[in-house]
Amino acid sequence: MSDSPASPAPLHAQIDWDDQGLPHSRHYDDVYFSREQGIEETHYVFLEQNRLRERFAALAPHECLTIGETGFGTGLNFYCAWQCFAEHAPAEARLQVISVEKFPLTHIDLERAARLWPSLAAFSQPLLAQYVAVHPGFQHFSFDGGRVTLTLLIGDVLEQLPTLDARIDAWFLDGFAPAKNPDMWTPALFEQMARLSAPGTTLGTFTTTGWVRRALMAAGFTLRKVPGLGKKWEIMGGTFTGLPVDGVSSAPDAPWYRRPPAASGPRRALVIGAGLAGSATARSLANRGWQVEVLERHAEVAQEASGNPQGVLYLKLSAHGTALSRLILTGFGYTRRWLTNLQRGRDWDACGVLQLAFDAQEAARQAKLADAFDPSLLTAVSRERAEAIAGVTLPAGGLFYPEGGWVHPPALCQAQITHPRIQVRPHHQVLRLARVDGLWQAWDGDHLLASAPVVVLAGAADVRLFDGCADLPLKRIRGQITRLPATEDSQALGTVLCAEGYVAPPRAGEHTVGASFDFHSQDLTPTAQEHQGNLELLREISEDLHARLTRDGASSDSLQGRAAFRCTSPDYLPIVGPLADRAAFDERYAVLRKDARQVPDLPCPWLEGLYVNSGHGSRGLITAPLCGELVAAWVTGEPLPVPREVAQACHPNRFALRTLIRGEPAARRR
């Protein structure tokens, strides 16, 4: 995918509240819902026309119904759909709602709107509790133990829907009236709805405008008019019957990025590795009704890179819409919502992150970011303002990320992996996998440890021990952190400070300072030399804070810390998704060596049931939880929680593809 400048960050909805306490869009000069019959209209137009009550009741165990919506607005339709699902669906069924919103409400406005419907408080309050870090792109929410998910696509509907990889069962064709918002109600929108639908997909909409009706029919929907409610004479329901012969259909994905068949049979999986990636993957599968065994070679979870006392929720973004930047924005929001399950102050803290403009090049980079993103995500601050935020003297101003902070990674791992359908098996080191009678067997030498139809490799660079991953260009980078006892003076630090290194406010009486980068050493014994290097990184961040933390004159020989390996890929994107047989891949797509424009229509030789979640580098706190959801979506055939282009940019097959196109031999790395 080619990188292009990011669209300006969408502003929040500009709302006026009338004398009755109802919201009115200033931008569209239109109401969000009927003044007289808001809830009744939602039930009639969207729930009844899509027959949701009956369809929810008919769902099989673990079956998922997916709703697509154009215009999230105040969330009323979502609350009503969730309520209907909760009242009528079997206990093990699931609901996914995917909703586009160009101008999301602020938390204050969303909360004010929710107070209008006290009968829906059981459904609005969980959303309000998680309604943080809602920024452009895909924003993924999980409720009721993962039984209900919401993915908000923040941005213009004609930019967002083309990036969605999903199959929609029911459409809420909502939004401001066509006369007020003509840019949305276009044939291009209806063509995207058709692309995402299957025969039998239903829709409900309040509009019966003639050109809307004709454009929907041209896209493959059969429509019916039905009497409306109140002042609305008529509304429409419909069913997708298939694209007409001359309909517009999008080109299919290249075979190496198409989905493998969704897993069938027993819902059992093995996850190898109990760090951030493994625990997140296990939880995402367990939330979908899978029994998961986590095989961990250590005595406890989070013993390698995920075991540091503090990690930073820091967004290293691009001012352009790169795949990595989009992944970071989506992952940051998902992690921040996950953290609401943990104890603030002990397990994490939203104290913000201040990235110092430590030289002219960094200052120029930050200026571009400040122009590209909304101030709710990041804002440029002067040196004086930065010092007021930090509570210590600083050499420069920088960018402040108010929603950032620090996390105790072992606490996040433990929270993710604690689930009745997850069993952690410590001291289980998997050395070999074998596929026998439709099951993957995990072996430790001659000892069979466990077996299941699905295996997810989440052991950082050690995934290269196994077929399907042996050729992945993962590299290990040693990093060492230093733990400094907090002093009375250092307690003033009010935010995470970052430059070439970082320092966090105290947790459990200690600051974490880091981290070194060593591309050569394979020894994880902490060294005095690297402790001294971390102290120098601290000095560059703040001479003042350095003095406050080192006044007792402790030598670097006596300092405490730990070292671990980061695992990263050449393009700095994680490696997430289904794995293919590399030899068969090279043979099947060998024509690419001669002509990269060829796209052979040959199915990818998948290693059935084998997946990977690795290569998160120093961004695991932001990317690993979301990528657990991405793996689960690949496994189950559900909608992907990230844009299709981002999922492909993270796909394991990207490296085999590049090797073929460049005519390079595959280099197995063991």
Give residue spans per PLM region.
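S-adenosyl-L-methionine
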Residues: 111-162
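N-terminal Rossmann-like FAD-binding beta1-loop-alpha1 element of flavoenzymes
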Residues: 267-293
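Helical element adjacent to the flavin cofactor pocket in flavoenzyme catalytic cores
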Residues: 399-445, 450, 454, 458
